Amino acid sequence: MAWSPRHSAGRRLQLPLLCLLLQGATAILFAVFVRYNRETDAALWHWGNHSNADNEFYFRYPSFQDVHAMIFVGFGFLMVFLQRYGFGSVGFTFLLAAFALQWSTLIQGFFHSFRGGYILVGMESMINADFCAGAVLISFGAVLGKTGPVQLLLMALLEVVLFGLNEFVLLSLLEVKDAGGSMTIHTFGAYFGLILSRVLYRPQLEKSKHRQGSVYHSDLFAMIGTIFLWIFWPSFNSAPTALGDGQHRTALNTYYSLTASTLSTFALSALVGGDGRLDMVHVQNAALAGGVVVGTSAEMMLTPFGALAAGFLAGAISTLGYKFVTPILESKLKVQDTCGVHNLHGMPGVLGALLGGLVAGLATREAYGDGLESVFPLIAEGQRSATSQAMHQLFGLFVTLTFASVGGGLGGLLLRLPILDSPPDSQCYEDQIYWEVPGEHEHLAQGSEETETQA
């Protein structure tokens, strides 16, 4: 498609101007509000008797490092399956996450760590910011290849605010348990992105259908993302939990759930595939559903068997979703879900929230002993019954779906503004429209455009 000189000039300026504006505004807010916390500040840490080994850095940084790798390597490479959108998948993941980390530090800080007029930052705030970035990248997966970088940054600007608000309502007001984010991260990110995709529906997307598939090497690169996510997911779910048995139990439950979801994915993929052959799309995504489904319940006394059962069910549901649900969403509901986030994050996230409610409802002093105070402090103090905690968990799911749906709708209306740069229907899933693409890839893209023009 040929762009007019005026449109090309405006398009060229939108991204740099928005990046500079967002970074400038964020920097000013950091200067005014953000300060080191006690364990990061030189004066505060050395005031009193502290051993360096007691600093939270040495307890939290290994988990943070794993979560950080998941955000930038895992999510980025998982989305490179599109044959001609590898630069956009990894590059825009990099851009969105870098902005979301700064913006969410401010938003989450105002809600959770605002003390004496300042936001205090340290290892915990870094981990929480990564979690927020994860939700943004899940939403990105639903509109991958169909939106420009300016639209994506504005999506992140809105979504981070709503993520922080939803998280505050769930964790601070309702006091639900959701350490691994089945609700706050996966369910919120998935349905925010799906509603956004519905509002941005493209009836002429068929013009770019030939680019929506994968090729051998793009699927292979996407498997790198899968393996990174699979390996580090126990750290993702356990990073914010209390040190000791809770963190240990969370990692263990996630570990077993992932193994079970992998086996069920291979089983179902071969069962529904042609001639019993495996589909790499299923393996890349549904094998990870085990990490999503135990996000809420992993720190609870789920039991190893419960973790296996949950993971197996999540892998099966996710695989069947890719095979049967995704086509229905597109044909009947007009939801164009590029990465299938409904199958990897949406349905397993909702299932995980329901599982968390069930396990919370079964909590007893006999099962948890003195550990009940760290997992369910309100039950331990007698302020809530186990049944009441379960109902709060389920209400948290309803609140999350409400925030995600309303937020996704508002985000879609914002991104539909005509002034915002967006790829035309015939150039979706194409790197060349936003990136300098060297070598053979560029020539192939040009040849494809010439063929379309002649047709």
Curated annotation (Swiss-Prot):
- On the Extracellular side, which residues? 35-61, 108-124, 173-179, 241-253, 299, 365-393
Q: Which residues lie on this side of the membrane: Cytoplasmic?
A: 1-13, 83-86, 146-151, 201-219, 275-277, 321-343, 415-455
User: What membrane topology is annotated for this entry?
Assistant: Multi-pass membrane protein
Q: Where is this region: Interaction with ANK3?
A: 416-424
Enumerate the Pfam families for this protein.
Answer: Ammonium_transp (PF00909)
Give the record's keywords alphabetically: Ammonia transport, Cell membrane, Glycoprotein, Membrane, Transmembrane, Transmembrane helix, Transport
Residues crossing the lipid bilayer are 14-34, 62-82, 87-107, 125-145, 152-172, 180-200, 220-240, 254-274, 278-298, 300-320, 344-364, 394-414
Query: Where would you say this protein principally sits, based on its record?
Result: membrane
Q: Which GO terms of type biological process are on file?
A: ammonium homeostasis; ammonium transmembrane transport; transepithelial ammonium transport
Q: Which GO terms describe its molecular function?
A: ammonium channel activity; ankyrin binding; carbon dioxide transmembrane transporter activity
For this chain, the Swiss-Prot or TrEMBL PTM comment says: N-glycosylated.
| Family matches, as InterPro entries | Ammonium/urea_transptr, NH4_transpt_AmtB-like_dom, RhesusRHD
* UniProt motif (Basolateral sorting signal) ranges: 429-432
Reaction catalyzed: NH4(+)(in) = NH4(+)(out); methylamine(out) = methylamine(in); CO2(out) = CO2(in)
Report quaternary structure and partners.
Interacts (via C-terminus) with ANK2 and ANK3; required for targeting to the basolateral membrane.
Reported function: Ammonium transporter involved in the maintenance of acid-base homeostasis. Transports ammonium and its related derivative methylammonium across the basolateral plasma membrane of epithelial cells likely contributing to renal transepithelial ammonia transport and ammonia metabolism. May transport either NH4(+) or NH3 ammonia species predominantly mediating an electrogenic NH4(+) transport. May act as a CO2 channel providing for renal acid secretion.
UniProt similarity note: Belongs to the ammonium transporter (TC 2.A.49) family. Rh subfamily.
* Protein name per the record: Ammonium transporter Rh type B
Species name for this entry?
Bos taurus (Bovine)
Q: What is the lineage of its organism?
A: Eukaryota, Metazoa, Chordata, Craniata, Vertebrata
